[in-house]
Swiss-Prot record:
Organism lineage string: Bacteria, Bacillati, Bacillota, Clostridia, Eubacteriales
GO (cellular component) term, any one: bacterial nucleoid
InterPro entries: ARFGAP/RecO, DNA_rep/recomb_RecO_N, NA-bd_OB-fold, RecO, RecO_C
Pfam families listed in its UniProt record: RecO_C, RecO_N
Keyword Nucleus: no
Function field: Involved in DNA repair and RecF pathway recombination.
Keywords, alphabetical: DNA damage, DNA recombination, DNA repair
Family of this protein: Belongs to the RecO family.
Protein name: DNA repair protein RecO
A GO biological process held by the record: DNA recombination
Length: 246
């Protein structure tokens, strides 16, 4: 069996048999993987503290014919404050679900991995509006999984766009005044500019943006529609996010 060491975050965990756990880990080197942690349900197990959701650590895994098997590891951070605060937990769980639905097993995506880790740290620090942070992450998720939105040129005629009031949800980008408006959404021009800013700006800089509630609602409408359309299933956490917003 091959022995592999990689950083990673537990995005989902499930009890398996009497004492074991199944883990879904977003790793730096292998992408999203499924692993079994033998005996991890026992509180005295060396794997017990390593196998909780949102645990970020360095993991040593064996790769056999089937599942990976977790051998040992070392915690970098467990993002524990996210587990005790409902709002933080909901947003962090949503991030994990996005990773789960957007990636195939063992599909390496280092750029997305870096954005994911950064976003979890920023949620934990409370330094930035969670809502803006999540919208920015959604746009980067779309970009790094092949569905990035285009804002600088019309998706149809390719003419340069300074701003637009229409997003094509089929072709993932802005539409100029001369091209047909179909299979998309009319939005405020301020929303268009906000989308472009969040798409192009690093996550730790999105705090610079101040938006009205109308623009925030339109941002959510655009990203949630596309995410629900292009991936394997609609994120269940979206409903909880709507509940928190209300």
């Amino acid at each position: 069996m091959a022995l592999i060491e990689s950083g990673g975050v537990i995005i989902k965990a499930q009890d398996y048999k009497e004492n074991d756990k199944l883990l879904w880990i977003f790793t730096e080197k292998m992408g999203k993987i499924t692993a079994i942690a033998k005996g991890a349900k026992k509180s005295k197990s060396k794997l017990f503290s390593l196998t909780h959701p949102l645990c970020y650590g360095d993991y040593l895994l064996f790769k056999g014919k089937g599942l990976y098997r977790l051998s040992e590891g070392k915690i970098r951070t467990s993002f524990q404050t996210s587990l005790t605060d409902l709002e933080k937990l909901t947003y962090a769980s949503y991030l994990c679900e996005l990773i789960d639905i957007s990636l195939q097993d063992e599909e390496e995506n280092f750029n997305l991995y870096k954005e994911f880790i950064t976003c979890l740290y920023l949620i934990n620090t409370e330094a930035i509006s969670y809502e803006l942070l999540i919208r920015a992450f959604e746009l980067k998720l779309l970009k790094y999984t092949g569905y990035g939105l285009r804002f600088d040129n019309c998706v149809f005629c390719k003419n340069k766009l300074s701003v637009s009031n229409y997003i094509s949800l089929r072709y993932f980008g802005g539409v100029c005044d001369k091209c047909p408006k179909e299979h998309g959404l009319y939005i405020n021009k301020a929303t268009y500019n906000a989308l472009r800013f969040l798409n192009n700006t690093s996550l730790d800089k999105v705090y610079r943006l101040t938006l009205t509630e109308e623009v925030k609602a339109e941002l959510f409408k655009v990203t949630s529609f596309i995410i629900s359309s292009v991936y394997s299933r609609k994120p269940k956490s979206l409903e909880m996010l709507k509940f928190i917003k209300e």
